[in-house]
Amino acid sequence: MFNRMMDKKTMVSAADALAGRSTSIAVPAEHYVNHHAMLNDAGGIAVPEGYKKALFGLGCFWGAERKFWQLDGVYLTAVGYAAGYTPNPGYEEVCSGATGHNEVVIVVFDPAVISYADLLKVFWESHNPTQGMQQGNDSGTQYRSGIYCYDNQLSIAEASKQAYNQALLDGGHREITTEIIDAPVFYFAESYHQQYLAKNPGGYCGLGGTSVCYPE
């Protein structure tokens, strides 16, 4: 059994992770900010024909989601959990460190308006990707930096990491600790987390970058 008193900055093993459940979390029918339909017929994130999706972890997902929904060309955003072991986890379970999941934001975008490379620039500049299992004062495996790749995104993400890592080193920062892997299953977070900072403009946002610009 997973020891809940363990260091929350240490990844739980698959054997020790919480069992989870078969029932998925219910989410709103439409996006609170732009009112687009959130779900497809299968209950996943809605992706119109010709659009793409991207998945990022960059600390507390409230602020991360806002960074992306503000961009031209972004059709939908939603927050959730990914890259762990527990199926259909809840927020408190993820915060316990006993699921292995990261807090993530899924982004549906129009590649004719904004490219995946453009999204990566926002990702890198919006947080500190050198901090391992934390982001600012938020500590735990659920706050790790991560890029989770669909289709042909893996090589683009890896190249962007190499470029930004050099920019950080040149600026006196540490090496990037961001994990870059194929996109795992995305589980929606609870309804109250979706577009949280639009519903609660004065809400907490611990997101902060390094002030190092992504190289053009």
What is the predicted function of each stretch?
Residues M1-E216:
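Flexible coil/turn and secondary-structure edge motifs
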